[in-house]
């Protein structure tokens, strides 16, 4: 039984999605010629490239069994899909922003009849209804941040990762509407009828995500100092300890640690007598 996964053809979430699939063992067979459909290293999995904004609807309609796209686009489309995984990248906030010199400090200050420019009219209109705000929504397809300065709108809603673009354009966030990141989604019928292969891929993807920012630290230590090493290397469920057959009184210790802790950890390990220390990248962690 085959499945098709829709992946963004371009944009900031495209290459990370392709890289994630590759690391999960589902790399593209043809990495040079980007076509609409591409076979992968897995004989039962095919990739379909499309606009990120169209992926929620393609998955909901069954044109693709799975999809990788932003949560903001899923909500904007209102697509009936199963969200399987948060892929831990592409994080951004959909914010309501006004010019720095505006008297609007919060949603309660928005005057009746104000105009809001956005690429997300559905989410914006829902927000206005929830807050009882009588405002007009104007849909734009880009350069939303200039709308207040050319007389098109009084405010905007736009995606922001760091806030830098808003500040550069003299805009100030007055409210956060939605937190977004990239999701793995599934067609509901496909998830029921093709659960075997879908769960196989899901496990591979989750293993890659769980391994990000982790390193396997391996070392040798005299048994008499083992407890001191254990205190420094708790690992995921405790360090793995095994005998070193060629050297009496020495044991090997393995543990998974956060990458950001490695630098300081090595110095502390050496201080308690650890030697032959190896730090190894981890491709996947499968619980």
UniProtKB/Swiss-Prot annotation:
GO terms for molecular function: ATP binding; ATP phosphoribosyltransferase activity; magnesium ion binding. Keywords: Amino-acid biosynthesis, ATP-binding, Cytoplasm, Glycosyltransferase, Histidine biosynthesis, Magnesium, Metal-binding, Nucleotide-binding, Transferase. CDD domains: PBP2_HisGL4 (cd13594). GO terms for biological process: L-histidine biosynthetic process. It holds the Pfam family HisG. It is found in: Cytoplasm. It catalyses: 1-(5-phospho-beta-D-ribosyl)-ATP + diphosphate = 5-phospho-alpha-D-ribose 1-diphosphate + ATP. It comes from the Archaea. Its EC number is 2.4.2.17. The keyword GTP-binding does not apply. Its cofactor is Mg(2+). PROSITE patterns: ATP_P_PHORIBOSYLTR. Feedback inhibited by histidine. Pathway: Amino-acid biosynthesis; L-histidine biosynthesis; L-histidine from 5-phospho-alpha-D-ribose 1-diphosphate: step 1/9. GO terms for cellular component: cytoplasm. NCBIfam families: hisG, HisG_C-term. Belongs to the ATP phosphoribosyltransferase family. Long subfamily. Catalyzes the condensation of ATP and 5-phosphoribose 1-diphosphate to form N'-(5'-phosphoribosyl)-ATP (PR-ATP). Has a crucial role in the pathway because the rate of histidine biosynthesis seems to be controlled primarily by regulation of HisG enzymatic activity. This is ATP phosphoribosyltransferase. The lineage of its organism: Archaea, Methanobacteriati, Methanobacteriota, Methanomada group, Methanobacteria.
């Amino acid at each position: 039984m085959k499945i098709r996964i829709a992946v963004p053809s371009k944009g900031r979430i495209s290459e990370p999605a392709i890289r994630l699939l590759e690391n999960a063992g589902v790399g593209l067979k043809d990495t040079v010629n980007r076509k609409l459909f591409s076979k992968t290293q897995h004989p039962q999995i095919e990739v379909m490239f499309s606009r990120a904004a169209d992926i929620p609807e393609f998955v909901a309609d069954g044109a693709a069994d799975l999809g990788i796209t932003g949560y903001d686009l899923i909500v904007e489309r209102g697509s009936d899909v199963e969200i399987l995984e948060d892929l831990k990248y592409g994080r951004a906030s959909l914010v309501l922003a006004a010019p720095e010199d505006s008297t609007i400090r919060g949603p309660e200050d928005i005057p009746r009849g104000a105009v809001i420019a956005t690429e997300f009219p559905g989410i914006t209109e829902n927000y206005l209804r929830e807050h009882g705000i009588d405002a007009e929504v104007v849909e734009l397809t880009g350069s939303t941040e200039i709308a207040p300065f050319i007389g098109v709108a009084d405010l905007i809603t736009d995606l922001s990762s760091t806030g830098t673009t808003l500040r550069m354009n003299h805009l100030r966030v007055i409210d956060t509407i939605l937190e977004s990141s990239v999701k793995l989604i599934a067609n509901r019928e496909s998830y029921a009828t093709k659960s075997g292969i879908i769960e196989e891929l899901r496990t591979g993807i989750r293993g890659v995500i769980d391994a990000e920012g982790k390193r396997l630290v391996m070392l040798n230590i005299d048994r008499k100092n083992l407890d001191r090493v254990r205190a420094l290397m708790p690992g995921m469920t405790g360090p793995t300890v095994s005998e070193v057959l060629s050297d009496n009184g020495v044991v090997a210790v393995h543990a998974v640690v956060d990458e950001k802790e490695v630098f300081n950890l090595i110095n502390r390990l050496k201080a308690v007598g650890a030697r032959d220390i190896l730090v190894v990248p981890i491709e996947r962690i499968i619980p």
